[in-house]
Structure formats: structure tokens, C-alpha cells
Amino acid sequence: MVNLNPLANALTTIYNNEMRRNKQAIIMPASKLIINVLRAMQKEGYIGEFEFIDDGRSGKIVVQLLGRINKCGPIAPRYPLKYKDLLTLPDYVRRYLPSKEIGVLIISTNKGVMTHKDAIRERIGGVALGYVY
């Protein structure tokens, strides 16, 4: 079976393991985008350490879960967000986060993958990849 969206698969795997109260999740296949998204989630304190395991194919990522995720998932289609959109959070973004202060959007910008809070500090826009709260 072909995996059409590895990022959606990774975020769903994390969410499912979190709901089952597992201490770790194994994500496969691994990619640079998934690793950068995990770094953004780790920086916000939603997940613990993670480790890339090279198995000679596409690799695996073992993520330590902390039990702090209520919901996470991909945003499809990937909406482009301008800097001004991040300040007001348009309607199609509000359906992913419960409020302006709770949770983060994960955005791919020209300076790398970061949360929407970091993008507001940097004053740049990007493309919405996923959400976590």
C-alpha cells in the first residue's frame, strides 16, 4: 500500500499512541520534514526525546510521549498563511485550534518549520502543515 501523506501518517500515529497511553510511538517512514515537525513539537513541550533509526530503507523514528497531547493532526489542504493572517487567525484555521492561546499551528516557512508563535515573532508567513494542542 502506498503512503500518500507521510506527515499525516506520523501525526495520526502520535495521536493514536497518545490516546492508548503508550510511552513511545514508532513512526515510519521517516523524512526530514517529519523530523523538523517533531523538533517544533518538542520545543513546545508536547513530546519528549526522539531518535532516528536507520534501517537501510526509509528509516524509523522512535518518539517518547509525555501525555500532554489532547489532539494533533495534519491540515489538508495546506493553506498558505500570510503574516497578517497569523495575527487574526482566519476561520479555516480557527477550526483546528480551540482558542487563540491554546495549541500551536505548525508552519513551513522559508526559514524552516516552526510554530505560528515563532512565525509571528519572525514576522513571516508560510504554509500550514498541522496542529497540536
Swiss-Prot record:
UniProt-recorded Gene Ontology molecular function terms: rRNA binding; structural constituent of ribosome
Pfam families per the UniProt record, alphabetical: Ribosomal_S8
Top-rank taxon, per record: Archaea
Keywords: Ribonucleoprotein, Ribosomal protein, RNA-binding, rRNA-binding
UniProt keyword annotation of Nucleus present: no
Gene Ontology biological process: translation
InterPro entries in UniProt: Ribosomal_uS8 (IPR000630), Ribosomal_uS8_CS (IPR047863), Ribosomal_uS8_sf (IPR035987)
Annotated Gene Ontology cellular component terms: ribonucleoprotein complex; ribosome
Subunit and interaction comment: Part of the 30S ribosomal subunit.
Cited PANTHER family: 40S RIBOSOMAL PROTEIN S15A
Function, as annotated: One of the primary rRNA binding proteins, it binds directly to 16S rRNA central domain where it helps coordinate assembly of the platform of the 30S subunit.
Stated family: Belongs to the universal ribosomal protein uS8 family.
Protein name from the UniProt record: Small ribosomal subunit protein uS8
Lineage of origin: Archaea, Thermoproteota, Thermoprotei, Sulfolobales, Sulfolobaceae
